[in-house]
Regions:
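Beta->alpha loop/short-helix hinge microenvironment recognizer with preference
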Residues: 1-290
Length: 290
């Protein structure tokens, strides 16, 4: 049988808990769901065909977002809903990535507030820029933001993907549509607005940050995505699923786990990474937020 995440958890979790005994309630729920998924622990259904008398039994799925066996149906439904919402306008994928110096805010007592600030700052920055009459002039605009907390090596790398139509409504209730398929707003302007809104909201937290972080460029990327369908389908693979699927697991040998990853800095070159089993679990569980 091909190696799977469920097997990794079953093999290495006892050793992992010796050094990291305190997991969050959300992480415990995820572990329980994943290890019981499609097993007798969750029961099942027996399907019978009256004409041919054939019977088939299927165990229940856990449907937990962190389970690599689940999420396909929820993903399909999400993609269909988002495709149906599209407007007739050029679409863009905007990605917001926080500087590494700010990532410690996403641990411990500040975590929920930090994620709230991340979403709010990105949304406010987009609204500001889309409202500028030099670019679109829409005082009312809408978009879909999706949080990813991982990179291909399962390291903590929080970033937001936002699907943005170049469309909105101005102060006179007139519907506006961007005329360019390749330009939404200037990246430097969006970077500055994102940084400004994040900083103003962070002041509410009793958390110290190196002042130099406010003087560097923040990671903002804008890519044109035509009708938006490709962006929705791409992000749909992650909305109802987790950081790594069973298909990327290459080997489970001894004390190690080997999995495939793509090196984004070298043109998505395929690579292989081997980690101790306990380190794989640490990285995997880091992306279980709720």
């Amino acid at each position: 049988m091909a190696p799977r995440v469920i097997g990794i958890l079953r093999r290495f979790l006892p050793e992992y808990l010796k050094t990291r005994p305190s997991l969050t309630p959300a992480q415990w729920r995820a572990i329980r769901a994943i290890t019981q998924c499609r097993t007798p622990a969750l029961g099942g259904h027996r399907y019978a065909c009256a004409p041919c008398q054939k019977e088939t039994f299927a165990f229940h799925s856990c449907n937990h977002r962190a389970c690599p066996q689940c999420g396909r149906e929820a993903t399909r439904e999400w993609v269909e809903r988002e495709l149906a919402k599209r407007v007739h306008a050029p679409y863009f994928m905007v990605t917001f990535t926080l500087p590494a110096e700010l990532r410690s805010a996403f641990f411990g007592p500040y975590a929920k507030a930090a994620y709230d600030i991340f979403f709010a700052a990105a949304a406010a920055a987009l609204h500001d820029c889309l409202a500028n009459p030099k670019w679109l002039g829409a005082t009312t605009s809408g978009f879909t933001a999706i949080l990813h907390t991982w990179n291909q090596q399962l390291l903590f790398h929080p970033h937001l993907h936002v699907i943005v139509p170049a469309a909105g409504i101005n102060a006179n209730d007139k519907v506006l549509c961007g005329k360019s398929n390749t330009f939404l707003v200037p990246v430097p302007a969006l970077q500055a607005a994102f940084r400004r809104h994040f900083r103003s909201r962070l002041k509410a937290l009793d958390w110290q940050v190196d002042p130099a972080v406010w003087r560097i460029d923040w990671g903002v990327n804008i890519q044109p995505f035509g009708s938006g369908a490709a962006a929705i389908k791409y992000l749909g693979a992650y909305v109802c699923r987790t950081a790594i699927g069973d298909g990327r697991i290459r080997a489970l040998e001894g004390d190690s786990v080997t999995f495939a990853w793509k090196d984004r800095s070298h043109g998505n070159a395929p690579k292989i990474l081997t980690l101790p089993g306990s380190e794989f679990i640490r990285r995997y569980l880091r992306h279980v937020l709720a």
